[in-house]
Swiss-Prot record:
Any coiled-coil regions, as ranges: none
GO cellular component: cytosol
Keyword Metal-binding on entry: yes
Subcellular location: Cytoplasm
UniProt protein name: Phosphoenolpyruvate carboxykinase (ATP)
Family: Belongs to the phosphoenolpyruvate carboxykinase (ATP) family.
Pathway: Carbohydrate biosynthesis; gluconeogenesis
A Pfam match: PEPCK_ATP
Stored Gene3D superfamilies: 3.90.228.20, Phosphoenolpyruvate Carboxykinase, domain 1 (3.40.449.10), Phosphoenolpyruvate Carboxykinase, domain 2 (2.170.8.10)
Length: 541
């Protein structure tokens, strides 16, 4: 086994002294044999489906647990992490001390000692100058499979000299019974130590915690190098034109960027440096609720051997009912990016974006279907991050909830939101990227905008077939709207058409405007926030 000595050092650093076996960088056939072993019980065991993908059940953990995310507060991090106890603007980055960290390491070690361990070395980041070498360790075969799907596999020469920058331990059975003594939120934890370069995940089986944990790490490392770290998907046209799609989970990042007419760069997490845009991952993590081959053929056809279906309804004949949300509305599939036919070459890297699209799921129905933003409006809406939390993406979310998520990914930001906004908008200005706001939510009749019409809007943006004039705008928000888009009824372009009267639209728009104004007060103490106040909604128009 390559790197055995280094692996043993890694294990010893957390207190793992004995193991029954180490399976290093297993291939998919080995993982399949391990994860479908009939001796496995409960959430460890996987089911082979008719689509040849395996299906896993993550128990009660069908979404992320943001209240269970922690950073060790020490000399390195105390003055730079955006902490949950920040008086001006609280985050999800809850502090723990070194004593609690040591206890969590012991818990991980106790759960992994004398176990069969799966160890996978991979890259987080397709750009060679800015990637992170990651070692992943778990005792659960399908979690190793998930990591293998989601990150970038080194070639043999790279493995021979692989020394990790960061280590991830994912141990779902490591339940912290001392959580009250540690003053934590629950018995589960996603704990990051940036001094020891280690991420510990315990108590939760949800695969998304693995990828989002490393996303949080990249969100710390890259901005300190003046590189934009972004919660977005990305694709490239036949003319090498790059588009970014920002948005919270469930707003359409994966669906809209996976397009047969364009090449996929990545579906969720990207960096933007002087070389261009690069994906952090080597796989995709798509929502599957109501998935059909007719509406989303690329994603549907990616569900095959080596894919992992998470929390889907498996029928007795091993077929999948993608329309059954009994378990969760947040059912998912993880697959290697090469399951998508149209991907960029070299994989997961491209040039600088021509178009940037903010996806917002407006639950009020007052936002236009599409609008064009000025540079400063782009800063304001990026910092505001208005959208709706959609069903199942976090534990406890059932109906769409209007929310503000700074940078369209507040839960994953390690530093203050203004850090990301300044860096991103610097790149946008330098490379003259255009910014659009697309509403993938609801109209005033509480009807969800259709995927068909949304794709027509995206196509119009990317093909330069959308025109805006200053005189055609939505008041209060001062958002420019087009008069006509091929494939979209004119009625849909002005949100006021879906209200019983203009007064009713104004009433709802005023309610939302007040939420914008209230939310942006958390930036009023910052230099950037003071600069952007004048771009907030105007209630008395």
């Amino acid at each position: 086994m390559k790197n055995k000595e280094n692996i043993l050092i890694t294990l010893n650093q957390v207190g793992i002294e004995q193991y029954s076996n180490i399976i290093y960088n297993p291939n998919y056939d080995t993982l399949f044999k391990e994860e479908t072993n009939k001796n496995l019980k409960g959430l460890e065991r996987c089911i082979l489906t008719k689509l040849q993908a395996i299906a896993v059940d993550t128990g009660k953990f069908t979404g992320r647990s943001p209240k269970d995310k922690y950073y060790v507060r020490d000399e390195k991090t105390k003055n730079i992490i955006w902490w949950s106890d920040d008086n001006n603007h609280k985050s999800n980055n809850h502090p723990i001390n070194n004593e609690t960290w040591k206890d969590l390491k012991k818990l991980i070690a106790n759960n992994l000692n004398n176990k069969k361990l799966f160890v996978i070395d991979a890259f987080c980041g397709a750009n060679k100058k800015n990637r992170l070498k990651v070692r992943f360790i778990t005792d659960i075969a399908w979690q190793a499979h998930f990591f293998k799907n989601m990150f970038i596999e080194p070639i043999e020469q790279e493995l021979n000299k692989f020394l990790q920058d960061f280590t991830v331990f994912s141990v779902p059975k490591a339940i912290n019974k001392k959580w009250k003594d540690h003053k934590l939120n629950s018995e589960n934890f996603i704990a990051i130590n940036l001094t020891e370069n280690t991420l510990l995940i315990g108590g939760t089986w949800y695969g998304g915690e693995i990828k989002k944990g490393l996303f949080s790490v990249m969100n710390y490392i890259l901005p300190l190098k003046n590189i934009a770290s972004m919660h977005c998907s990305a694709n490239e046209g036949f003319k090498k034109d790059v588009a970014l799609f920002f948005g919270l989970s469930g707003t359409g990042k994966t669906t809209l960027s996976t397009d047969s007419k364009r090449y996929l760069i990545g579906d969720d997490e990207h960096g933007w440096c002087k070389d261009g845009v690069f994906n952090f991952e080597g796989g995709c993590y798509a929502k599957t609720i109501n998935l059909s081959e007719e509406k989303e053929p690329e994603i549907f056809n990616a569900i095959k051997k080596n894919a992992i279906l998470e929390n889907v309804m498996v029928l007795k004949d091993s077929n999948i009912n993608f329309f059954d949300g009994t378990k969760t509305e947040n059912s998912r599939v993880s697959y290697p990016i090469n399951h998508i036919k149209n991907i960029v070459k070299p994989i997961s890297q491209s040039g600088h974006p021509k178009n940037i699209i903010f996806l917002t799921a407006d639950a009020f129905g007052v936002f236009p279907f599409v609008s064009k933003l000025s540079y400063f409006q782009g800063q304001y809406y990026f910092l505001s991050g208005f959208t709706s939390k959609l069903s199942g993406t976090e534990r406890g979310i059932i109906d769409p909830e209007p929310t503000f998520s700074s940078c369209f990914g507040e839960a994953f930001l390690s530093l203050h939101p203004t850090v990301y906004a300044k860096i991103l908008l610097r790149y946008i200005k330098y490379y003259n990227s255009k910014i659009f706001l697309v509403n993938t939510g609801w109209n005033g009749k509480r009807e969800r905008y259709s995927l068909e019409y949304t794709r027509s809007i995206i196509n119009a943006i990317l093909d330069d077939k959308i025109e805006f004039i200053d005189e055609n705008y939505i008041p209060i928000f001062n958002l420019k709207i087009p008069k006509k888009i091929e494939g979209v009824p004119d009625l849909f372009l002005d949100p006021r058409n879906f209200f019983s009267s203009n007064e009713e639209w104004i009433k709802q728009a005023t309610i939302l405007s007040k939420k914008f104004i209230k939310n942006f007060k958390k930036f009023s103490h910052t230099k950037l926030g003071k600069k952007l106040i004048k771009f907030e909604p105007k209630i008395n128009f």
